[in-house]
């Protein structure tokens, strides 16, 4: 009768007599975690650095000339804005972060999904990753926008109203006018040179499209099939309305808004698919190696098997 022996894979013991998983130094793990958080914050700061420098310094946009008969820059200056900067930032950031907080809470505590992080609280780890990716995308989008504004210096539709050049000193027969002096307030004149591309369009498209993709990945409830598409449609319409309002307010040309939409959508897709883990395949927990079965033959069986081979 044959007997079998099963060999099990044994975890190598550490110097302290236990397994490595049980002998990790908590202080070492905590310091490593703090170091990684500091590295993330440094990357976030570097992504936002161009935006911070341009907004807080006296960097002036490129000084572009104009044509006297250019009707696209002769619109009046509207004092009030349909959607000002404060409303744009508040709505875009608050809605996105609230949606992420709710979505990650539902995923961790209701769906019981696990996090790969070593943090004891998986909800905090998931929230840190998703909010961090969103803010990183915001920083990149705004830095791209401000770099384009100061580098290109396209004139806004209300430029001549703000600049108020002295046409008595300008010879319009020369065609493209480069030598001119603005009599308007300098800060408003410099702002009127930042038409391309629309910051409202790029920021609103990034935040809303990021939320659309977040809902696509996290909103898994199948009770109402049209609820998720309705929410996604609403978010995109909010972004489109924000961009189109800039044309109605004479702040941007239509091409500025289209370029802003394209930039915001591109950054949102890159952040979602290449930085975050929203659409990455979930890996199952690794199973232990199967037991190895070894056949042990008795002396009689060995003799019989040898005789069989000799006869062959």
Curated annotation (Swiss-Prot):
Residues 149-157 are annotated as: Phosphatase sequence motif I. The modification Phosphoserine is found at residue 19. Residues 55-85, 145-194, 245-258 are extracellular. GO terms for cellular component: adherens junction; basolateral plasma membrane; endoplasmic reticulum exit site; endoplasmic reticulum membrane; endoplasmic reticulum-Golgi intermediate compartment membrane; Golgi apparatus; Golgi membrane; membrane. Residues 1-33, 107-123, 216-226, 280-312 are cytoplasmic. It is found in: Cell membrane; Basolateral cell membrane; Endoplasmic reticulum membrane; Endoplasmic reticulum-Golgi intermediate compartment membrane. SUPFAM superfamilies: Acid phosphatase/Vanadium-dependent haloperoxidase. Pathway: Lipid metabolism; phospholipid metabolism. Detected in lung, cerebellum and heart atrium. Keywords: Cell membrane, Developmental protein, Endoplasmic reticulum, Glycoprotein, Golgi apparatus, Hydrolase, Lipid metabolism, Membrane, Phosphoprotein, Transmembrane, Transmembrane helix. GO terms for biological process: Bergmann glial cell differentiation; blood vessel development; cell adhesion; cell-cell adhesion; cell-cell adhesion mediated by integrin; ceramide metabolic process; gastrulation with mouth forming second; integrin-mediated signaling pathway. N-glycosylated. Contains high-mannose oligosaccharides. The record marks 256 as: Stabilizes the active site histidine for nucleophilic attack. Residues 276-312 are annotated as: Mediates interaction with CTNND1. The chain crosses the membrane at residues 34-54, 86-106, 124-144, 195-215, 227-244, 259-279. Its main location: membrane. The active site is at 200 (proton donors), 252 (nucleophile). It catalyses: a 1,2-diacyl-sn-glycero-3-phosphate + H2O = a 1,2-diacyl-sn-glycerol + phosphate; 1,2-dihexadecanoyl-sn-glycero-3-phosphate + H2O = 1,2-dihexadecanoyl-sn-glycerol + phosphate; 1,2-di-(9Z-octadecenoyl)-sn-glycero-3-phosphate + H2O = 1,2-di-(9Z-octadecenoyl)-sn-glycerol + phosphate; a monoacyl-sn-glycero-3-phosphate + H2O = a monoacylglycerol + phosphate. A motif (Dityrosine basolateral targeting motif) lies at residues 109-110. Its EC number is 3.1.3.-, 3.1.3.4. It is a multi-pass membrane protein. Belongs to the PA-phosphatase related phosphoesterase family. Forms functional homodimers and homooligomers that are not required for substrate recognition and catalytic activity. Can also form heterooligomers with other PLPP2 and PLPP3. Interacts with CTNND1; negatively regulates the PLPP3-mediated stabilization of beta-catenin/CTNNB1. Magnesium-independent phospholipid phosphatase of the plasma membrane that catalyzes the dephosphorylation of a variety of glycerolipid and sphingolipid phosphate esters including phosphatidate/PA, lysophosphatidate/LPA, diacylglycerol pyrophosphate/DGPP, sphingosine 1-phosphate/S1P and ceramide 1-phosphate/C1P. Also acts on N-oleoyl ethanolamine phosphate/N-(9Z-octadecenoyl)-ethanolamine phosphate, a potential physiological compound. Independently of this phosphatase activity may also function in the Wnt signaling pathway and the stabilization of beta-catenin/CTNNB1, thereby regulating cell proliferation, migration and differentiation in angiogenesis or yet in tumor growth. Also plays a role in integrin-mediated cell-cell adhesion in angiogenesis. PANTHER family: LIPID PHOSPHATE PHOSPHATASE, PHOSPHOLIPID PHOSPHATASE 3. This is Phospholipid phosphatase 3. It comes from Mus musculus (Mouse).
């Amino acid at each position: 009768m044959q007997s079998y022996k099963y060999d099990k894979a044994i975890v190598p013991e550490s110097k302290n007599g236990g397994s490595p998983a049980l002998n990790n130094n908590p202080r070492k793990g905590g310091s490593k975690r703090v170091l990684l958080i500091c590295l993330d914050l440094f990357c976030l700061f570097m992504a936002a650095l161009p935006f911070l420098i341009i907004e807080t310094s006296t960097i002036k946009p490129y000084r572009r000339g104009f044509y006297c008969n250019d009707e696209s820059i002769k619109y009046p200056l509207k004092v009030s804005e349909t959607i000002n900067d404060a409303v744009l930032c508040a709505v875009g950031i608050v809605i996105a972060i609230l949606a992420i907080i709710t979505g990650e809470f539902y995923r961790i505590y209701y769906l019981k999904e696990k996090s790969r992080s070593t943090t004891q609280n998986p909800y905090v780890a998931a929230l840190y990753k998703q909010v961090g990716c969103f803010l990183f995308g915001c920083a990149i989008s705004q830095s791209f926008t401000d770099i384009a504004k100061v580098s290109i210096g396209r004139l806004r539709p209300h430029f001549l109203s703000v600049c108020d050049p002295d046409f008595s000193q300008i010879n319009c027969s020369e065609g493209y006018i480069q030598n001119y002096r603005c009599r308007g307030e300098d800060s408003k004149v410099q702002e009127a040179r930042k038409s391309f591309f629309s910051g409202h369009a790029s920021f609103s498209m990034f935040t809303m499209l990021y939320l659309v993709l977040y809902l696509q990945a996290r909103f898994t409830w199948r009770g109402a099939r049209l609820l998720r598409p309705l929410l996604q449609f609403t978010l995109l319409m909010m972004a489109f309305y924000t961009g189109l309002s800039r044309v109605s307010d004479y702040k941007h040309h239509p091409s500025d808004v289209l370029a802003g939409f394209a930039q915001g959508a591109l950054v949102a897709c890159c952040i979602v698919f290449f930085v975050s883990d929203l659409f990455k395949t979930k890996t199952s927990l690794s199973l232990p190696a199967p037991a190895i079965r070894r056949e042990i033959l008795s002396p009689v069986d060995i003799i019989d098997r040898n005789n069989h081979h000799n006869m062959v």
